């Protein structure tokens, strides 16, 4: 029985030795990085492709070409190397072209499904599975029965559930707009939440603002953490210099010294409170930067608190969206009553256009 050449130790040793030699000679004898990459890529592909080759003649031919490639590299015959690689390139191009043609041919056979058809199929599948679990339908149902008999029943059941939810929402009364917030760092970004502006209807500017504040808050936190690390090193330097001058080791409560109070005057915040000159020289510059960062953060908090007051003012966004929500509710209630009186009593399952899904779509539900 033919044995794989990869399992013969002498063959494996020879191929690996030659491969290492060629890899070492490529950068030595070829000065084009692009051509070096091309040779290595082609060589790697061919070795992987013929790894399990059992044909002695094929292996013999490939080893001769491998050895010839190494000799051409040593002699600087780059054109001959290109000639050796040409048949491999042609084969690759033909294979790629065949793949593209096959994919284009298969594209013509694929039927693109309408999203509405996909939705109807899911409704039908869920309906059949539910009824089969209850033992109300057999395991096998012909396609004709599924589409002509069960599909209208499934869509009607789905529409009935939808109608019930609409009725419950209208029964609960008009929805009201309210204030909500998202927290980014110290900031509470307030915005109006209502049925009018939920989901995709939400303001794009609000999304941009929230992302910007999130990024700025994180940057501020990172800067403060960096300053705290530098302040610790600065305090060590101050203690060392003070010791060199006075032979005394000073003690400073660094967290308390760097503590920022938001409700005292700025002049008090930034004045150095240490009695040691070296601490003032080393730690105070970092401390002042930290105070500026804290001050900037609290300014943003004040800005968003004032923004909340604007939203709550008479005639502001909250009142506007609350009014629009009530108008939308009144309009939907009128349409629902009209639909209940004029159309719902005459719904027919198996007549397209007069079934319940079509009626709900007609009235915007």
From Swiss-Prot:
UniProtKB keywords: Glycoprotein, Mitochondrion
GO cellular component: mitochondrion
Places the protein is found: Mitochondrion
Coiled-coil regions listed in the entry: none
Domain of life, source organism: Eukaryota
Main location: mitochondrion
Modification(s) after translation: N-glycosylated. Glycosylation is important for correct localization of the protein.
The keyword Mitochondrion appears for this protein: yes
Function: Essential for respiratory growth and required for mitochondrial protein synthesis. Required for vacuolar acidification.
Annotated family: Belongs to the RRG1 family.
Protein name according to UniProt: Required for respiratory growth protein 1, mitochondrial
Species of provenance: Saccharomyces cerevisiae (strain Lalvin EC1118 / Prise de mousse)
Gene: RRG1
